Amino acid sequence: MAPRILKHFYMKDKYMFEAYKDNSELPQKVRIEASSKCQLDCVQCYMRLDPEGVEKGCGLGNLKFSDFKKFVDENNFESIEISNHGEIFLNPELEKIIKYAYEKGIELYAGNGVNLNYLPDKIAEALVKYKFGSMDVSIDGASQQT
């Protein structure tokens, strides 16, 4: 019985999405995660527990450009927050993501924070060139112990 119920909800949600996807009253902002990886091991961060055993600390993966492109092309958002728990600058396809959003007129921002421990020059240049919206910078601790 459970698979039938799940199929019902999937079909209902799919129909509702298709019926209203161009409706300007739907949310114009969304948060997706460019990377769930992080090079830090902050004591206060629950992501460091790594329940999946993928890597030490955070580390489930990066948003693929192809997935981002499909998401953007199938929806009508004005802005997208691309930060959540990982460090966005660890995504090797971030420059393409930033450029594509700019070309589509979508503002990107990182309101949930970045740590800036890794910021390649080409990404820093892309942030300026493609008018990245804003970002909050997170300080990982007051000392080595915290």
Model-predicted segments: where are they?
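Conserved alpha-helical substructure of the radical SAM core
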Residues: 2-135, 145-146
